[in-house]
């Protein structure tokens, strides 16, 4: 076979490998749903009855295989990897402190689809506090895909339904959030950057932006994770609560219109959508801006 034909065959094979859809599988084991991509462990959705709220951990990078997020880190034991919660909800705390202050309880975590090019997980959760009427029910849906060998996506849709009139006082502890692994934090040489190219806590804190990304070097690899806000979200683009030590969250409840509280009536529904991009390379190399345009 000629050298040209060998090169042509290699290019065709490479293209086939790159275009081939990853096989994504999920299995429910006790209070976890474990997800693998092409046989490699990616993440678990954890909904144990002794946790404050359901969350994803680990969230393994596509290159290193290690989690890009961390659990119960140092001074902030309430940071559980990739999670959704809120403080100051009708006097309850569905973010930190003891379980008696408030919990988000999974009552129906299920695998809706698995085994092909995506996994779909659904859950129904009740926000519960002893001695108080439950203020919120939420329905959540997660779609996990892998468009390339270096990118994993978790598309998140959470519908909050107010079971009674709800008042959320101004709080920096609100809604969808992530705590990165220490080696990817700015304090340890990583980079935090938003859609406008601003970097670091000082430049990004309180700034409204469609997306935010953390990335850093781990061994021979650079890996990271971005959170994208969908344009249909209320308050889009929400200002971000960012910390150089590795925390980031689009946090509308910290910047309410009257600088005091957010009020919602019984029966009101709040639909929130996010895309989590777990990627090799930095934000530019992973083309996070292009992934946001596709997400819109």
Give a label for each model feature.
Residues 37-40, 110-119, 146-150, 217-222, ...:
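A short, structured loop/turn motif at beta-sheet edges
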Residues 48-51, 55-58, 147-192:
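Acidic (Asp/Glu-rich), glycine- and aromatic
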Residues 125-129, 142-146, 160-164, 180-184, ...:
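Beta-strand elements of well-folded, non-transmembrane domains
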């Amino acid at each position: 076979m000629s050298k040209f034909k060998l090169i042509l065959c290699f290019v065709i094979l490479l293209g086939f490998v790159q275009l081939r859809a990853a096989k994504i599988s999920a299995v429910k084991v006790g209070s976890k749903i474990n997800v693998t991509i092409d046989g490699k462990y990616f993440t678990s959705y954890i909904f144990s009855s002794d946790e404050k709220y359901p969350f994803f951990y680990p969230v393994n990078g596509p290159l290193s295989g290690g989690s890009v997020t961390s659990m119960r880190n140092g001074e902030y034991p309430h940071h559980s990897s990739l999670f959704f919660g809120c403080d100051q909800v009708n006097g309850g705390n569905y973010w930190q402190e003891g379980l008696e202050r408030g919990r988000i309880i999974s009552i129906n975590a299920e695998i809706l689809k698995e085994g092909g090019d995506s996994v779909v997980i659904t859950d129904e959760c009740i926000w519960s506090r002893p001695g108080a009427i439950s203020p919120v029910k939420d329905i959540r849906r997660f779609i996990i895909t892998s468009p390339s060998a270096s990118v994993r996506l978790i598309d998140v849709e959470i519908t909050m339904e107010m079971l009674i009139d709800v008042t959320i006082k101004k709080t920096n502890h609100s809604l969808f959030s992530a705590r990165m692994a220490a080696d990817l934090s700015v304090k340890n040489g990583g980079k935090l950057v938003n859609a406008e190219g601003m970097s670091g806590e000082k430049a990004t804190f309180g700034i409204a932006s469609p997306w935010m990304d953390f990335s850093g070097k781990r061994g021979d690899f650079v890996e990271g994770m971005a959170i994208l806000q969908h344009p249909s979200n209320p308050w889009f683009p929400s200002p971000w609560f960012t910390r150089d030590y590795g925390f980031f969250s689009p946090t509308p409840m910290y910047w309410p219109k009257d600088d005091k509280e957010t009020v919602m009536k019984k029966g009101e529904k709040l639909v929130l959508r996010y895309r989590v991009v777990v990627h090799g390379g930095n934000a530019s190399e992973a083309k996070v801006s292009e992934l946001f345009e596709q997400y819109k």
